[in-house]
């Protein structure tokens, strides 16, 4: 998919933040050190999802669970998804739940129109089962704005996201997209890109550092695949606040076991 190129004026309009934004979700501080880990629920069935949630709930190295709704066999059945989401939230207890529909436009399994995307998320937000919601920044802009406002009204944090499984955009473009997410009202800024070279990995990491110097928002950035693993491990050194790990099955190329990830994060964590 060819994504729109954003202007670079967003970087110029931002100044070095005086302090970082932090959020307390189910007693978890998001936005400060140490880096918080996310683990995906990649199930196709209700039973598999419940089992995976129990494993995440019991794993001390997993801080947040991501519910990959698009991977479910019944992803289009809103009522079933909401019911399952409520069960997952109960099982996870003190661990936050991030609800995500990764659409086919950005490497996911569910193909939906902008109207359908807005309708589904609006239904979820009537009585939220999640504490965080992933909203793709390049969906219809009016829908993104409406969903972001609705999520905030319901006290749900917005993880605004962008994914490029084909390439790594320029450093300038990555910076521009992340700062655009900030201007669009995101609480957490996310981008995932695919490297073709070592330089691509450093492009993502340098962009993360630049955005961290211009935005107060927590950053969730990654260079995917084995080549980009270092970006997940050293994210704190670049100003990142969150990183994806896995227990069992990965939801994206390059994810590593969450226990190993946690140890790596502790080893390279910069001194405050």
Curated annotation (Swiss-Prot):
Q: Mind listing the UniProt keywords for this protein, alphabetically?
A: Lyase, Quinate metabolism, Schiff base
Q: Which Pfam families match?
A: DHquinase_I
Sites where the protein binds 3-dehydroquinate: 66-68, 102, 232, 251, 255
This protein's pathway reads: Aromatic compound metabolism; 3,4-dihydroxybenzoate biosynthesis; 3,4-dihydroxybenzoate from 3-dehydroquinate: step 1/2
> Which EC class heads this enzyme's classification?
lyase
Example of a GO MF term: 3-dehydroquinate dehydratase activity
The alphabetized list of GO BP terms reads: 3,4-dihydroxybenzoate biosynthetic process; chorismate biosynthetic process; quinate metabolic process
Q: Which PROSITE patterns match?
A: DEHYDROQUINASE_I
Under the heading InterPro entries, the entry gives: 3-dehydroquinate_DH_AS (IPR018508), Aldolase_TIM (IPR013785), DHquinase_I (IPR001381), Type-I_3-dehydroquinase (IPR050146)
Location of the active site: 163 (proton donor/acceptor), 190 (schiff-base intermediate with substrate)
Annotated EC: 4.2.1.10
Question: Which reactions appear under catalytic activity for this entry?
Answer: 3-dehydroquinate = 3-dehydroshikimate + H2O
Keyword Zinc among record annotations = no
> What switches on its expression?
By protocatechuate.
Q: Which family does it belong to?
A: Belongs to the type-I 3-dehydroquinase family.
Q: By its UniProt entry, which HAMAP family does this protein fall under?
A: AroD
Q: What the protein does?
A: Involved in the biosynthesis of protocatechuate. Catalyzes the catabolic dehydration of 3-dehydroquinate (DHQ) to yield 3-dehydroshikimate.
The protein, known as: Catabolic 3-dehydroquinate dehydratase
Organism this protein belongs to: Acinetobacter baylyi (strain ATCC 33305 / BD413 / ADP1)
